[in-house]
Every structure is written in structure tokens, then in C-alpha cells.
Amino acid sequence: MRPRLGQAIPASHRVRLLCSLLASSCVASFAPTAFAQASTSTDELKAQVAQMRQQMEAQQQVMQKMQQRLDELEAKESAQEKVSQAASTTPATPAPSRVSAAPLVATASAPEPSKPAPYRPPSAPAGVAEPLPEGYVRLGDTGNLLKLDLVAQLDTMIDNTYMGSSDLFVPSSIPVRGQPFYGSGWRTNLSARQSIFRMDFRRDTDYGTLKVVYKNNFFGSGTGDMPYNMQFFYGELDNPYYTLLAGYNISAFTDIDVFPNTLDYEGPNSFTFKYGPQIRFSPVLYRSGDSKLTLPLSMEKPNADITKIGNYSPYSRLADFTLGLRWETPNWHIQWANLFRDLGMQDSTNGHTQRTTAFASQLTGSTKVFDLDSAQAWFSNGHGYANFLQDISGLGLDAAFTSNGTLRAIRARGWGVGYTHGWTETLSSSASYGYLRISPTADMLIDRELPKSTKFASLNLAWQFSQRAMLGIEYLWGQNISLEDMRGQGQRVQTTLRYDLNP
């Protein structure tokens, strides 16, 4: 086939053309020699013939090499034609992604739900429960996964009287008759202290899943509108046989799963709630399907809350210890927890000490009632655990000196209930009630204006108007009765707007 004008000549055609030219030159060199045979002698003719043979042998070797090259080129062109024909009939394959070895969003190693995520009512506190499986990010090739959650929340509060803690509803801070600010009238406050920053790290190890959790809000003791307050900073090793936790976390005496769904951060007065450094070991004693029996054990930092008298200051020789038993099923759970404490006072001048022991027991439980309804309940009783009770923590009521100079733990008890009703999956109401009482003996040297008993009640309506936003309103009522039987009541209406980035 002859190439058209301007068309490139294939390599095989060029080789054939070169072979033809060599053959022509060979014939041309032979013709003059034949005509010269008549005028030359026999010896000269033989010499010319020998020379011509050498030239023809050399040219034959060149032609063999060129033929070999021609065969190689033809084979290569044939292979290229087959590839081009296959490419024209096969759909194009998309180019591979430049980053495929370590995807940013983790799926295979991230916790994957084996069943639908549990229902969370709109009024549920943010950043408390185990985070949802979605939203983890892989940190390169380290094997670590990270989930970040930011919660921005604004609470608007209108009180009918002075509250000792304006950002929290604390019945023990309500003034009673005869105290300053009693019946002081309405006041308004805005707070963003329930805003949260939380980080959940996790990775797989030979011993199970290792989790490291960090969380803070802004209910610190510093000055300003947003004082920093760390809530969680702990590591936890989780496997089918046990969990081992170490760091800063809620006390093992607390059952956070029965905390009612209040918009107010403080919650019921009688709920046991305390943070601190600890080590916690929870072996699994028995399993039956999705249900299990565990034995939570913990050693926690002691924090004796006793009012200073003279040169005496509170201290503890031993750590706080807890021992519990928990039965948990997919729809309900019950927990029995016990607290053991060592409380002491020491004179800074002569080193004289007074010590007493403290013990408390608590029974808690929650259950799913209907598809969107749940109920919670708790009861605690003991001596020397006032620092674990929401309403009287920090008031120095763990223990007190008697009139004869003996240190004794103060008895306290509290109970409460909560109920959440889901009108729809995005609209819910929660109600709760709590009662708390302390019973110091008559000869104890404590301030008689401190609370003897308090009551708490709440009712709210919360609307999850988008996947990441909630709007709610809550009514709160509280009563404070002092050791002198003076009474005071307070009411609050709170509205809450919350944005939760990655629950």
C-alpha cells in the first residue's frame, strides 16, 4: 500500500526500500565487471571475481541483519495495532485516586453499629453518652481514629428570686426567710457555659479497643463568663472480658445512665455526681446474649469535704474505694454501688488528728417503657458522702466535730425519679423530681443556716428541629429548708438553643 502525500512511512516499509537499494547497487557493481572480461587477462578476471564475491558476501550479511531488524519492527507494529484495537472497544478505566492507602474517613476500623443507634431524645444532655459510630477520622497510617465534637449552647434563664449560682438551678442556694436576698424578685441571666469541646480517640490493640476521651465545658471556678472546666481526660481498654479505665472521669459511684434529661446542667438535687482522678476495673462475670453482669471496682482520689474549725484542716489517709454490681440488658439496667471513705481532720500546730470512716450505698436503674419513652430512678443512703450529692457538695457536710471534740460522719440520703416521653422522634418532654435530706446529730458543731432538706422538680419540652440543632424550654422549681426550719422557694424558666456539630 502506497502512503499518501504527507503521510509518515512505516518503519518496515523504510527497511524494505533500503534492501532494494542495496540489491540495485550490487547489480550495478557487477555489470561493469562483466563487460571488462574481454580486454583483461585470465588472472585479472579471477581477481575481480574474487573481489566481487567478497563484496557480495559482505552485502549479504548486511541484508540478513536488516531482514532481522525488519522482522522485529513488523512484530512490534502488529502488537501495537492489537492494543489500539482493544482500547477502542473497551470502556475507559478511571484513573486511580492519588490517595488510596490511607483514607481520611475511617470505615473499616471505626466502630460499626451492629443494630440501629439507640434513640436519644432531643432533651438528652450533649456529650455524655458514648458517641455515635459515624464521624470518625483516620489519623494517617498511625492506626488511630479521632472524633471531634463541638457543642455551642446558649441558655436564657429567668428567676423569680436570687439564686446563689446564677448559671445553675441549685435549691440549696435559694435564700430562706431571714437570709439576704430572700424574696428579692425577678432577674434574668444568659449563659453559654454548657458549650462543650470533646475528643474521642480510639485504636485496636492486642488486648482490645483502646479509647482516650477528653471533654471540657465552661463551669470552672475562675472569673469571667466562660471559665474552663475539664470533665473527662481518661484512657479505657475495652474487650469482651473486662474494661480498665485510668484518668479523670465521673466517679464509679455515679450511674450517669439514670441522669434525667434536664436542660438545666445541674440536674436533680439528690443525684450523686463527682469527678476525680481514678483507676477503675470492671470484669464481666456473666453473659447471656446481649445482657451481662459486671463488677465495677475503683480507687479514686479522696476529697474530704469538712468545714475547717480552728487550726484543723481536712485530709484523708486512704483513697476512696467503690464496689458495685451491674446487670445490663439492651432495654434496661440496674446497678448497686457502694462507697468506702476515710475522713480526717489534722491540727496544723501540733499535728493532732481526728479520723472517722464513711460509707454509702446506692441503688439505681433505668428502663425503656415504650418505643420513645424511658424511666429512671435512684436512691442513696449513708454517712459521710455529702460531697457526692449535687445540692450540698462543697458545703463541708461530709463530717463535723461534736461538742466533745469527736469527728463524726454526717448522715445523708436522697432519691429521685425521671421520665421522658417522646411525642415524635424529634419532639420530647422530660419530667424529674428529687428529694435530699441530711440528719446531723444535735451536738454537731455546724452552721444552722445550712440546708436540712431540699426538693427539686423540672418539666421541659425539647424540639430537634434539625439533625444538629435543638430548641427547648424548661420550668424548674426548688425548695430549701434550713436546719433552723426556715424555708425558701425559687422558680426558673429556661430556654435552650443548642448546636451539636458531631454527636
Tell me what each language-model feature is.
Residues 2, 35-165:
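N-terminal periplasmic/intermembrane-space "pro-region" immediately following the signal or transit peptide
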Residues 133-172, 176-305, 317-333, 366-370, ...:
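Outer membrane beta-barrel
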Residues 19-29:
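Bacterial N-terminal signal peptides
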Residues 31-33:
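N-terminal signal peptide c-region/cleavage motif recognized by signal peptidases
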Residues 327-451:
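Detector for outer-membrane/organellar transmembrane beta-barrel domains
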Residues 463-465, 489-503:
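Outer-membrane beta-barrel "beta-signal"
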Residues 159, 204, 217-223, 249-255, ...:
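Sequence/structural signature of outer-membrane beta-barrel proteins
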